[in-house]
Amino acid sequence: MKLINDILKKNYRLGKLLDIEEILTGYCNQSFTVWMEKNKFISKFLVRRYRLGTAEQEIKFEHALIYHLRKSEFKLTPDLIPQTNGNSYVKIQELDKGKPVVRFWAIFEFVEGENRYTWMDTDLSDAEITSAGQVLSRLHCAAQNFLIPPGSGRLQPKIMDFLPTFQLPYSKFTNRAGKTKCGRLFLKNMDNILAIIRKTIISKSDLIKMPFLPIHGDYHQGNLKYKKGRVVGVLDFDWAKIDFRLFDIALAVIYFSANWEKKRAGSLDRDKFETFIGSYNTACRLAESPGHLTSMEKKFFPSMLAAANLFVLHWAIVNFFTAVNPNDDEYLEYFDHNLKLMYWVENHQRLLADWIGL
């Protein structure tokens, strides 16, 4: 790709470009593996082209958090490769449908390890789930005391402020929803989705008692690299933000313990749930702060789990209705899964409280 070669030549001193391979597993950004030769030594890097519309302040936040994590001895996130001028990203003008647009690019070190799963794959080994829980705990511990640089930050609100905003885009989607299988399923369930959103409330007086810190925001098995049953890399911090720790944990539980198999689809697997939470808590006990799950976090875990699933469902809904020619069958699987899970979580609040140890 000529554009990548031009960016590398103009802004970096990484040597001669030998090969480029696009990574096709992402949904938002475009990523490439590149092989560079310098002084007869061949190195691999990851090149990211941020999705159109990404705000510069969000990239500044993401990169500052990555630097903080690595300085705090969390080395599982790949380091950023600075330009010759020291900046961590490249800002250029490209053409989109004939119109000039601003796009951002960044280069990361390449993390070796296995890409074993997508976010839909939950057949992880106990060792892999245990390691994932431990690593998320280490990430939260390292993320503390992060100072947000001026002019940086995630535009998306905190999860409990974000949920009430879902109604506005949903009302806009109804006019064209009946033309597709996804649209018809959305219309059939929209009132129930909005009703459950209204029920999923945690008061501010309770929220302020919970740990509030930088979170990954998209911690799933597809964003991790593995080696011999251990997590050896944590990728894709572009959804990171400052939010309640409990949301990050609940979101991870939705990903790591959800059942996708037909007979049990749309439910959570208790063994995987307890393995992940148990390993997270055990790892947290080794650090003074933020510590293991508090009694307040346990009390509202079922509610935050509902919020986390609604968050994932919302991503699928918005992506489907705003994409150009989305794959109806692909998104139907996402819609169906998270809708079933929405109802399962709603109907098993007492059971979930038992699982979390209330």
Predicted regions and their residues:
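ATP-binding pocket architecture of kinase catalytic cores
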Residues: 40-148
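A glycine-centered beta->alpha junction motif in the catalytic cores
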Residues: 86, 107-121, 171-176, 310-326
